Amino acid sequence: MLNLNELKSGFHYFVMGWHYITQKGLRRFVIIPILLNTVLLCGLFWLFISQISSAIDWVMNFIPDWLGFLSFILLAFSILTILLLFYFTFTTLSGFIAAPFNGLLAEKVEKMLTGENINDDGLADVIKDVPRMLAREWQKLRYSLPKIIALFLLSFIPLVGQTIVPVLTFLFTCWMMAIQYCDYPFDNHKVSFDVMKNALGNQRTQSLTFGGLVTCCTFVPVINLLIMPVAVCGATLMWVENYRNGLRFNMNRPFSSQTGLDVHSENTGIVK
């Protein structure tokens, strides 16, 4: 069921992300993700433009003749599916490349919000954590890849592949964007992937709203060059206001597989 309060909060955190990238003290941590984002996006966009025509022809070959009168609508859905698959490729690559820098940005945003240091060793501590960060990105890829493959296989089914699959792909992409960017502040506190995923699922409308806005802005020229640090800043604010108090002191306690909340406590301290 759609939760209007979570819908508003998801929008709020996205908007606040734009506010924080301009704050003094954070700008130098924003520059590197923007530069990496620009180089990677330009390269993949060139590849996408050079291959889009062949990809569309390939997808349209699966549409039977008796659905020819719907070809224009089905073509639009096919293009949407291809765009989302392109987006998934982009976010996966950018996640691996920019993970250390995004983790550092999330750390600095949290320090600005709370006044507390997460790591005391500065750059040395970040370098030490790079293998763990890359392992975390691999964990996210293992979670998402089987679902992407399933959606890809479903796209071969006539009509279903051109109507239902694009919608499911978009929703899954929104969910993955929430996971991708919220994971940086969670991972800075070494909260496990499963606990993080369950916690976000407990406020699914908020997560999907935030992830949906990030997804849509990725397709807007110029804005898409800034969206990575914006999403990291907004996700960190979401962590601080919704999950930080309830999770960071309870990481060693058992959590419900359905809700991600501490099963030994009726009040987890999560701020609504």
UniProtKB/Swiss-Prot annotation:
Record GO biological process: cysteine biosynthetic process; sulfate assimilation
Topology with respect to the bilayer: Multi-pass membrane protein
A Pfam family annotated for this UniProt entry: EI24
GO cellular component, one term: plasma membrane
Subcellular location: Cell inner membrane
Transmembrane segments: 29-49, 66-86, 148-168, 219-239
Highest taxon, organism lineage: Bacteria
Main location: membrane
Annotated keywords: Amino-acid biosynthesis, Cell inner membrane, Cell membrane, Cysteine biosynthesis, Membrane, Sulfate transport, Transmembrane, Transmembrane helix, Transport
GO molecular function, one term: high-affinity sulfate:proton symporter activity
NCBIfam families membership: PRK04949.1
Membership in a protein family: Belongs to the CysZ family.
Stated role: High affinity, high specificity proton-dependent sulfate transporter, which mediates sulfate uptake. Provides the sulfur source for the cysteine synthesis pathway.
The protein's name: Sulfate transporter CysZ
